[in-house]
Amino acid sequence: MEGYIADAKRQYGDLADTFLKLYPVKSDADVPLMRAQAQNDEINWNMRQWAVAQAKAGKKAYTYFFTHVQNVNGQPSPAGATHTAELSFMFNNPKGQANQTWTDVDMKVADQMSSYWANFIMTGNPNGKGLPQWPEYKSLTGSKVMVLGDAPQVEPANPSAKLQFYTAAYQRMLRSSTN
């Protein structure tokens, strides 16, 4: 836990207290989960920045969150839906990851995801016949994202305190690199 706090202070400086409020730990056992959550949120922040840049350039962008928890050795993954966990689903590849055991729900998720990806590759738009509508992402406020879980659903993508934190952290990093 002490290393986690020291890392936050080293990486975020005057923003460390905000980071530690957003990703609190009470014991060493909490550290891996909070590190993983912070990593996912930072990736989310980056993804949304790219989507906004695409929209500003007049291009279409589609964002998603993968929340489906796969089974590993017959049990839900204790790490949850982690970064890159969606790869075997987007390619409809049930043998994509070692020890992954697929259920009927997994097969449905993979079929829908791979259809979205194939549509996007062919047309630049993930939407297609029989799939829930995936909205374009246009701005940090008011846009909606596709949540790819046990069943796809669209949710608001309003800025959260975590996204605001990463905006401030990156601005801080840019300022320090120009000094």
Question: What function would you assign to each model-found segment?
Answer:
Residues M1-D104, Y116, T123:
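Substrate-gating cap/lid region and adjacent catalytic-acid/histidine neighborhood
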Residues T63-F66, A110-S115, M173-T178:
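Short secondary-structure transition/capping segments
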Residues V72-S77, G142, P156-N158:
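Short, solvent-exposed polar/charged micro-motifs at secondary-structure junctions
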Residues A81-T82, D111, K138-L140:
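A structural signal for short secondary-structure junctions
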Residues W102-T103, M107, P156-S160:
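Short, flexible active-site recognition loops that position polar ligands and cofactors
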Residues D106-K129:
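Non-catalytic, well-ordered alpha-helical segments in soluble enzyme domains
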Residues T123, N127-P156:
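Mature extracytoplasmic/periplasmic domains
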Residues A151-N179:
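Tryptophan-rich aromatic "cage" segments
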